[in-house]
């Protein structure tokens, strides 16, 4: 199904005007949404638990409250805490303070779609999901444009939920460059699949496998790192800018021929079947339940996965090589760490 891109001119109702907005969480997305909305003239407060994020929000000039206090004061509440803590945060501090006619928003549909959070029928539920990390949402806004976003309505109690979603997207700068309407189901399942099968899980597994093939064949680990990881950014940037066509126009004929001949030997029909199995586990809720149950148990699986990943040879080789390349990593990493 084709969807139509919408822009600022399509946001017909200033649905956030006169509303008190509470951004719950001051992490990667939270700081960006809050600051952008404030800069577009909206009345924004922050709800966050005591700690570094609380202090940072106050330092940035926001009226900062506990989550419960902010939820009680607000008309529109955007929950931007990590997915795994949203349920307990909502049940303990937000739900008891909701009133009929309030609106609750999310930047990802995980907890609503999989029904970890159930919002009363007299409250709107909407989504504004920028397609980029928070530091980029903020930086591009300050530069005069923005990051595209998806928007959705899960529950329209007041008849105004879509207007709120679109006006929120406008307030954070996304409508400057483009909005796409979606559903909670579609955004959640596609987002998780993209992360797991391609962007994060698939990509890192592909890089690691390539590194292992080369080093096991006797090639120097340092050279293998450059071939399968370091140069990845150069290729991805070309695809990002102009699709596969621009990338293939920019590489050598040798590389292009090898692309066509060998790509299908690596990503076979069996790999596609494996991807379908990943999608099925997302659709039926298995992944979501496994993730939430691991969090509730103290994150034993996630902790073990992190330790295993940190000890990969490619990570150790890369850390040493990057010391000799000071130009690598000069971006927003330090700013990003502040908010996580």
UniProtKB/Swiss-Prot annotation:
Pathway: Amino-acid biosynthesis; L-isoleucine biosynthesis; L-isoleucine from 2-oxobutanoate: step 2/4; Amino-acid biosynthesis; L-valine biosynthesis; L-valine from pyruvate: step 2/4. It catalyses: (2R)-2,3-dihydroxy-3-methylbutanoate + NADP(+) = (2S)-2-acetolactate + NADPH + H(+); (2R,3R)-2,3-dihydroxy-3-methylpentanoate + NADP(+) = (S)-2-ethyl-2-hydroxy-3-oxobutanoate + NADPH + H(+). NADP(+) binds at residues 26-29, 49, 53, 83-86, 134. Pfam families: KARI_C, KARI_N. Its EC number is 1.1.1.86. Mg(2+) 2 binds at residues 191, 227, 231. Substrate binds at residue 252. Its cofactor is Mg(2+). GO terms for biological process: isoleucine biosynthetic process; L-valine biosynthetic process. Involved in the biosynthesis of branched-chain amino acids (BCAA). Catalyzes an alkyl-migration followed by a ketol-acid reduction of (S)-2-acetolactate (S2AL) to yield (R)-2,3-dihydroxy-isovalerate. In the isomerase reaction, S2AL is rearranged via a Mg-dependent methyl migration to produce 3-hydroxy-3-methyl-2-ketobutyrate (HMKB). In the reductase reaction, this 2-ketoacid undergoes a metal-dependent reduction by NADPH to yield (R)-2,3-dihydroxy-isovalerate. It is an enzyme of class 1 (oxidoreductase). Residues 3-182 form the KARI N-terminal Rossmann domain. GO terms for cellular component: cytosol. InterPro entries: 6-PGluconate_DH-like_C_sf, KARI, KARI_C, KARI_N, KARI_prok, NAD(P)-bd_dom_sf. GO terms for molecular function: ketol-acid reductoisomerase activity; magnesium ion binding; NADP binding. It comes from Streptococcus gordonii (strain Challis / ATCC 35105 / BCRC 15272 / CH1 / DL1 / V288). Belongs to the ketol-acid reductoisomerase family. Keywords: Amino-acid biosynthesis, Branched-chain amino acid biosynthesis, Magnesium, Metal-binding, NADP, Oxidoreductase. NCBIfam families: ilvC, PRK05479.1, PRK13403.1. This is Ketol-acid reductoisomerase (NADP(+)).
């Amino acid at each position: 199904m084709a969807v139509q891109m919408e822009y600022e001119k399509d946001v017909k109702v200033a649905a956030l005007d006169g509303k008190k907005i509470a951004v719950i969480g001051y992490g990667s997305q939270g700081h960006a949404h809050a600051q952008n909305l404030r800069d577009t003239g909206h009345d924004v407060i922050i709800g966050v638990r005591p700690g570094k994020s609380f202090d940072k929000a106050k330092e940035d000039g926001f009226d900062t409250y506990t989550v419960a206090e902010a939820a009680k004061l607000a008309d529109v509440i955007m929950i931007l805490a990590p997915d795994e803590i949203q349920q307990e945060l909502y049940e303990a501090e937000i739900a008891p303070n909701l009133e009929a006619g309030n609106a609750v928003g999310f930047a990802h549909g995980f907890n609503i779609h999989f029904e970890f959070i159930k919002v009363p029928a007299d409250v709107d539920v909407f989504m504004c999901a920028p397609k980029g990390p928070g530091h980029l949402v903020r930086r591009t806004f300050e530069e005069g444009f923005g990051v595209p976003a998806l928007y959705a309505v899960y529950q329209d109690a007041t008849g105004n939920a879509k207007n709120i979603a679109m006006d929120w997207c406008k307030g954070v700068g996304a409508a400057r460059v483009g909005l796409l309407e979606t559903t909670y189901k579609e955004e959640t399942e596609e987002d998780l699949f993209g992360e797991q099968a391609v962007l994060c899980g698939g990509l890192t597994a592909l890089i690691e496998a390539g590194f292992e093939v080369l080093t096991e064949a006797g090639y120097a680990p340092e050279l293998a790192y450059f071939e399968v990881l370091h140069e990845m950014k150069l290729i991805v940037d070309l695809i990002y800018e102009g699709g596969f066509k621009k990338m293939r126009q920019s590489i050598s004929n040798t590389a292009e021929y090898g692309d066509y001949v060998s790509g299908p030997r690596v990503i076979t029909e069996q790999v596609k079947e494996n991807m379908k199995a990943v999608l099925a586990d997302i659709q039926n809720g298995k992944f979501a339940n496994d993730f939430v149950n691991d969090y509730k148990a103290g994150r034993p699986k996630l902790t073990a996965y992190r330790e295993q990943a940190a000890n990969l040879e490619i990570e150790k080789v890369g850390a040493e090589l990057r010391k000799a390349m000071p130009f690598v990593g000069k971006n927003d990493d330090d700013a990003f760490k502040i908010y996580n």
